[in-house]
């Protein structure tokens, strides 16, 4: 259940209660694609040191390896990972349309080949729900088609209509699965996904249509896939007035610190992105003064922490010079330390956004940090 505590402009401060714990909103979901965050980050790190409230795992990848039935046999993702806070699983749709080979889209679902071994696979709304039920996640995402941007108007119209029909099937199947004896999580929630490319009218009509289904939450999908930032913000502005006020709002795959601040200002509650972990593994460090690349020669003898304004475990214990040395020496510890710092930074960013909303000074926070956090230093 989502409770809206207060607003400042369109920005929202709330509490989201789930069967696996309460989440303070707005929040960032740390991305553990294959039930692990790349960079050697364990569930113990996430819970004890990195201020993580919720993790995101990937249905497509877990279905292929180790297999959702194996995860079910192990007691579901929470037991498998030893992670006892909320987990969101995406539907697999994005990966089917971005990674899989030789896909064929039909009304019943999608036929495709595994990107791993070429094996023929079928996934439709019911199959996606069954896989996510086996995983036992807190929140399941509906199976949808994520169209390329730009795409022809007629194709996007037809795709959205099919995505709506798939969503109705997802809802029906989720209700059936949750009622079965032996279901790992009989309280599994379902979020619908708004699509429509960059066409305002399709986006709005699709959001109005799926808002009538009374789902547990709603996402804006199909953005942050190459379109200009201004276009993404415009789509959020168009769609947000039609999203239910009493349900969490999720912007999928976003983004930079500035993207998050600006999207919170537009009424978004939930975010996920591989950026903090992926960029960290290549030496890109987020700080409260901007973005630095730790392998630059300027940091060879720099005794400061990665961010002097950060109190994460890495910044409390290691210097820029040391972390730079680890990257240059190609030590595995380099990526782990950088990922730990960046994830802590993102979760701390959300904590500070929530605090600013609590204290009625979010706009001041936005003015101070929105541009600063994305600049190169």
Where are these regions (language model features)?
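A non-catalytic, amphipathic alpha-helix used as a structural packing/dimerization or gating element
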Residues: 127, 131, 135, 158-169, ...
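Conserved, mostly hydrophobic/aromatic
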Residues: 21, 55, 90, 132, ...
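Glycine- and acidic
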Residues: 149-152, 157, 217-223, 332-335
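Surface-exposed helix-capping loop/turn segments at secondary-structure junctions
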Residues: 173-183, 247, 353-365
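Non-catalytic, usually N-terminal nucleic-acid engagement modules in DNA/RNA processing proteins
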Residues: 1-184, 297-300
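Glycine-rich phosphate/ribose-binding loops and adjacent secondary-structure elements
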Residues: 161-164, 173, 177, 185-306
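Generic secondary-structure signature for well-ordered alpha-helical cores
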Residues: 137, 168, 172-175, 241-244, ...
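C-terminal extensions of enzymes
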Residues: 1-15, 23-30, 38-40, 144-150, ...
